[in-house]
Amino acid sequence: MKVTSFILIILFGTLLNAQNRQRPVSVELGKFFNEDGKRMLYGGKKDYQHFDVSNLSLEEDQFHYGLGREAFPALLEPEFTSIQKADKQWDDDDRFLVAKSGNDVKAYSIKDLTRHEIVNDELNGKPIMATYCILADLGAIYTRTYGDKVFTFALSGYTYYDPEVWDGLDGFVFWDRETESLWWPLIGKAVSGKMKGAKLHIYDETKWEDTTWSTVKSKYPNAKVLISGQDFERPTSWRKYEDVSDVKGL
């Protein structure tokens, strides 16, 4: 049994390495470049969309893709419907993330999160985000408040892997609109920008779960369910935090 398990681990690692080699490498695509003494990472067609990654703590040659930071519609003002209306759309075995606080319950289908990847939301008045990475098959609920500052997250258009982390799984790289720092959820922290080193905070794990539509209906009949197919006009400007020294260690 131990030998079989060892062989399976080796085969799994070999498969992941092969998959990573097949994905487009960002450096080879010219996504990293120098400008005005800074190391930059392509973020979109507009000059203001590029990321300053001069203090990046990750390896450039382990980044994949480079679709642009607004390629995925990471929701800013999500809309919801009732269990009764949503029940017409979902099958009992459809997968959902559910978060609760007091009487406030939100349900996010994995199918919708696959499209959005991030949903910036509030739960009982507190800023949270629901996230899902299809490559790593990982869903989670995070808080978005650091001290007195609220952060808003989106997808950078890149994935990243490290052979020493999660057996080399390729995972999405986030960015925040307030400081344009990059965050890698597989290690749970910011990896460049003003917030480098700051930790992603998982929402109280006793108050959210990865479950099915059948369970959502039976346990949370008053839950608000994310409406499918939402999109929005991507913002061209956003509030910026110039000084985060008082919150990045929180």
Per-range role (PLM):
Residues 9-18:
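Hydrophobic h-region of N-terminal signal peptides that target proteins for export
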